[in-house]
Amino acid sequence: MPPGWEWGEGMDENLVLKNRLREARAERGLSQAGLAELVGVSRNTIRSIETGQFNPTAKLALVLCIALDKKFEDLFYF
């Protein structure tokens, strides 16, 4: 950590994590419901992530990456 740097310094707590979830899901031929069942969440959760209304937890983001065979940086960005 750089000297004098504090965790969260200069970070916007309202920053939206953008994603390519819809595209990755389509590449796999999965519906929102199909992906939701695969990763153990509701279809509404998948929809909310795809539309940017909800940021997934680190655990859910990792599970989505595994389910869609994508690296984190290929699926999520700022």
Label the model's feature ranges.
Residues 1-22, 27, 33:
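N-terminal flexible/basic segments that precede or flank functional cores
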Residues 51:
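Short, conserved catalytic or interaction motifs in soluble domains
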Residues 26, 37, 66:
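Alpha-helical residues within the helix-turn-helix
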Residues 19, 43, 58-62:
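Short alpha-helical elements of helix-turn-helix
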